[in-house]
Curated annotation (Swiss-Prot):
Catalyzes endohydrolysis of 1,4-beta-D-glucosidic linkages in xyloglucan with retention of the beta-configuration of the glycosyl residues. Specific for xyloglucan and does not hydrolyze other cell wall components. Its EC number is 3.2.1.151. One of its GO terms (cellular component) is extracellular region. This is Probable xyloglucan-specific endo-beta-1,4-glucanase A. It comes from Aspergillus clavatus (strain ATCC 1007 / CBS 513.65 / DSM 816 / NCTC 3887 / NRRL 1 / QM 1276 / 107). Keywords: Carbohydrate metabolism, Cell wall biogenesis/degradation, Glycosidase, Hydrolase, Polysaccharide degradation, Secreted, Signal. Residues 1-18 form the signal peptide. It catalyses: xyloglucan + H2O = xyloglucan oligosaccharides. The keyword Hydrolase applies.
Length: 241
C-alpha cells in the first residue's frame, strides 16, 4: 500500500457525523481514533479505467463502520488502491507495544467478474519515529480471485501458527521496503485477535529488531481488477497498548 499522507490531509478532510462518501483519489475523513482513506494510489495502473468510492457510516472511539465499492480494469497484477481505516497514534518502538487487539467483521460481494483483490491489515515499521518506511507487515484475511502477496520465491518461507491459525508467510521487496505477508488458508470474515502476535513472531523467529518503530496500523482492501465489487465492514476496532 502506498499513499501521500501530507497530500491526503491537505485535500478532502471531513468528520463522521453522518455517512460520508469519499470518491476522489486522496479523499479522507478524520474522526475518533481513525483516519479513513479512499487512497486510489495506483489508479494510474488501470489502463482501461475504473473508479472507487468509500463510504464511512460511523466512527465512535476505537470502532468504525465503513464500505468501499470499486470497478477497475487493465493493468493485470497491479494494485489500484488501498481503501483503509488507519489508527491514529504516536509512533512507538515494538518493544514498547504490549498488544494490538483488533476485531474485524467484513464481507465481500460482487455481481461482476474477474474479481482479484485481498482483504488485509497493513503495518509499517521504521528505524526512527519520523523515518521512511523500511518494513511492511501485511496480514491477509482473504485472497480473492487468485490474488497473491509480494514474494521473492513464490513460496512461503514459514507456516507459523498465530492466534490459533496456521498462516503462510511470504517475504519479498517492495522498492526499498521488505514486505512480510501472512496469508490465511481461507477467507476469514470474522477476525478477532492480537496483531502483536505477528510482530512477536517476526522478532523472535525472523530476526526483526524490537527497536524498530511502529508507524501505521491499517485495515482495508487492495483490488487488482474486477467490477461491481463491494467490501462492507460491519465492525472494525483496534486498540494499541
Amino acid at each position: 500500500m502506498k499513499f501521500n499522507l501530507a497530500l491526503a490531509l491537505s485535500l478532502t478532510v471531513a468528520t463522521a457525523e453522518a455517512a460520508t462518501e469519499l470518491c476522489k483519489q486522496w479523499d479522507s475523513i478524520i474522526e475518533g481514533n481513525f483516519i479513513v482513506y479512499n487512497n486510489l494510489w495506483g489508479q494510474g495502473n488501470a489502463d482501461d479505467g475504473g473508479h472507487q468510492c468509500t463510504t464511512v457510516k460511523s466512527i465512535s472511539g476505537d470502532t468504525v463502520v465503513w464500505s468501499t465499492e470499486w470497478a477497475w480494469s487493465g493493468g493485470p497484477g497491479q494494485v489500484k488502491s488501498y481503501a483503509n481505516a488507519a489508527l491514529q497514534f504516536t509512533p512507538t518502538t515494538l518493544s514498547s507495544v504490549s498488544s494490538i487487539d483488533s476485531t474485524w467483521k467484513w464481507r465481500d460481494s460482487y455481481t461482476g467478474s474477474d474479481i482479484v483483490a485481498n482483504v488485509a491489515y497493513d503495518m509499517f515499521l521504521s528505524s526512527s519515529a519520523t523515518g521512511s518506511e523500511e518494513y511492511e507487515i501485511m496480514v491477509w484475511l482473504a485472497a480473492l480471485g487468485g490474488a497473491g502477496p509480494i514474494s521473492s520465491t513464490g513460496s512461503p518461507i514459514a507456516t507459523p501458527t498465530i492466534n490459533g491459525v496456521q498462516w503462510d508467510l511470504y517475504l519479498g521487496p517492495n522498492g526499498a521496503m521488505q514486505v512480510y505477508s501472512f496469508v490465511a488458508p481461507s477467507s476469514t470474515e470474522n477476525f478477532a485477535g492480537d496483531m502483536k502476535g505477528f510482530i512477536d513472531y517476526l522478532t523472535s523467529e525472523q530476526g526483526l529488531s524490537k527497536d524498530l518503530y511502529l508507524l501505521d496500523v491499517q485495515a482495508g482492501t487492495e483490488p487488482f481488477s474486477g467490477s461491481d465489487a463491494v467490501l462492507t465492514v460491519s465492525e472494525y476496532s483496534v486498540n494499541l497498548a
